[in-house]
Design a protein with these regions (language model features):
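Short alpha-helical segments enriched in small residues
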Residues: 1-168
């Protein structure tokens, strides 16, 4: 296994999902598939990680993840509302127990009037167990994407019932 600074968080997410018999799917915009890559680095992840959608384009968010176009027009794609709709969409699409999404501005330019480093992570779970985290990150494009993945994995572990957040 390749060791990265993010591997422990991905391993913790896989372990938490395995311990509860839950599954996960990802909907990524600004992270461009990095979160999926981290999950699949972990041995045994195929038991709990169903797959993901990289919905970089707005039309894919609407057409594949079923994000309402009216929501995009009202709040934009860089918003808590869009992040939560993406998480629900990937959960419905795959049948996963949990859907996690990432959207935001990795840079180098602002988007929708939002500063570089503006990030939203959402988790959609069973019985309305949803969470949205807003972050204001500093760094270059790659570091913002990496940090977003780390935080998304932390959110997954923190919101699985009976699991300790770990690696806080």
């Amino acid at each position: 296994m390749r060791h990265t600074t993010r591997a422990p968080r991905a391993a913790a997410a896989v372990a938490a999902l395995q311990a509860t018999g839950a599954t996960l799917a990802t909907a990524e915009s600004l992270t461009g598939g990095r979160l999926a890559a981290l999950m699949t680095e972990i041995p045994g992840s195929s038991e709990v990680y169903l797959g993901g959608v990289v919905s970089y384009a707005t039309d894919l968010k609407v057409e594949v993840l079923d994000v309402p176009r009216a929501l995009v027009e009202q709040y934009g794609v860089v918003s808590a509302e869009c992040a939560l709709a993406m998480a629900h969409g990937v959960r419905r699409l795959t049948g996963a127990t949990y859907g996690v999404s990432t959207t935001g501005v990795a840079g180098p330019d602002r988007q929708e009037g939002k500063q570089v480093g503006t990030v939203y992570i959402a988790l959609a779970g069973p019985d309305g167990r949803d969470a949205v985290v807003a972050l204001e990150l500093v760094g270059d494009r790659g570091s913002i994407q990496d940090r977003t993945c780390e935080e998304a994995l932390r959110v997954v572990v923190a919101h699985i019932p009976g699991e300790e957040p770990g690696l806080g």
